[in-house]
Amino acid sequence: MPDETMPGGRPSHVVVIGAGWAGWGAAKALCEAGIRVTLIDGMPDPTGSQPITTKSGKPFEAGTRGFWKDYPNINALTDELGAGDIFTDFTTSAFWSPDGLEATAPVFGETPQWPSPLGQMVATFTNFTRLPIQDRLSIAGLLYAMLDLYRSDKIFQQYDDLDAQSLFVKLGISDRLINEFLHPTVLVGLFKPPEELSAAVTMELLYYYALAHQDSFDVRWIKSKSIAEHLFAPLSRRLISRHHLQVMGGTLVRRVKVSPDSLRVSSVELMNVETKSVQVIEDVDAVVMAVGAKGLKSLMAQSPELSKAAPELVGAASLGSIDVVSARLWLDRYVPIAYPANVFSRFESLKGSGGTFFMLDQLHKDAQQALWGNEQPQGSVVASDFYNASAIAAMSDQEIIDRLTRDLLPASHRPSRIQQCQGC
């Protein structure tokens, strides 16, 4: 972190690349520390002031994000911005397979409070509709492994060297519990199947979201408009007006130049997405790279001095990236889906991806008109996200729509296929 002022009395200047959660978080912290900040992103309007819309004028947001109960930073931000009542109540989530309803995740805060994990076990005892109790009890070995994880650095490394699928099998977890619950949970939580994930990282996810505290898994959602409009837009206005934040949308960073003598950032080269014009910011003291591996790889390839000075960034840029596909459907009738937040499980048509879908007409029940833009509301609005979605991304828009409407979504609208498990 540079000093607040540089020699000569000018304020330190930091360029933040990327206007996602990480980029806005960095910009906020730096601005409030008295540092001049330029925030750069390829989106035309990273501030959220201009909502993203489809060609027909309907609102769209890339991905549906949940807000867990243990998000004190988000709660503090909404209070600080005076955002008001922007969230739904905490909601039940459901898991659906080709056989119908598999399980539901209750609102744990509404159940009797017991020490973890006893409280979670009691609260979910009747929430699996098809999975026999003997399969559910097979998860006991995983609870021991999670307690063992931090016993020493050596033990942690052993788990980190093992993939999660191998750990599940080694611990004797039943195939049904793995395939029908753990596998889809991990796919939508860490965006990769368990055979491609570190066992240590997977256990950290499960601990934080499900076992740390009984109600840590409780989740709620934005109940109108979008996250960008409710949070990023007021945050950007505050940082611009109070701290003179400069936001450059529709702009890509082509190169970060580093002085070979001092190994300090000397300039940042930019390109306008629309005009292809190039400009250089000379008075840069530091750069925050709030970008993914794909963007970082491109940037490092064009920044030889930086690559030489920071080989760890080259290593980070070599990591794989994850394809995510988001779709939103406006239906011509209301579909009575039992739960607003849902996870797909065991569908062959997912082609190895994880999938979720959300009934926005239920989550935004008091803001129906806003979901339809300038049109009269006609029916349900469904938002669906696919993770680890390379195969889905290669499909046409119509193919994705057909998979949702003909295969995936109908499974959650066939009550006759929801069977209560005998002996559960």
Segment roles from a protein language model:
Residues 1-14, 32-33, 54:
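Extreme N-terminal leader/targeting segments of oxidoreductases
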Residues 11-39:
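N-terminal Rossmann-like FAD-binding beta1-loop-alpha1 element of flavoenzymes
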Residues 31-54:
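Glycine-rich FAD pyrophosphate-binding loop
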Residues 52-77:
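N-terminal glycine-rich dinucleotide-binding loop that anchors FAD/FMN and/or NAD(P) in oxidoreductases
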Residues 187-190, 409-424:
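Flavin (FAD/FMN) cofactor-binding core of flavoprotein oxidoreductases
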